[in-house]
Amino acid sequence: MGETVTLAAADGHEFGAYRARPKGKAVGGLVVLQEIFGVNDHIRGLCDSFAADGFDAIAPALFDRKQSAVDLAYDDDGIAAGRLMRRGVGWDEPILDIAAAIEAVSRSGK
């Protein structure tokens, strides 16, 4: 089972991420990207599953720039809220967050 960690992007923005590490030495690192529903049970479960297979898996919370800890349901309300959130975040800044997540797991398995 993983844990919530804090990462810092190149622009200084601090954001949450869910990180699940394997019990032994990692075979590699993976960045799991959220859907419009945030880092929810499904995304955390994917990270845990990858960790069980030997990977250091991390899912950056890409909506943290607008609202922290977004965890939406797979229903009409969740879809509507997720679409609004995605439009509000844009594309450029989340790339910085993804780069920070890549850096966090880049040495795993080496």
Describe the predicted segments one by one.
Residues M1-K110:
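N-terminal cap/leader regions of alpha/beta-hydrolase-fold enzymes
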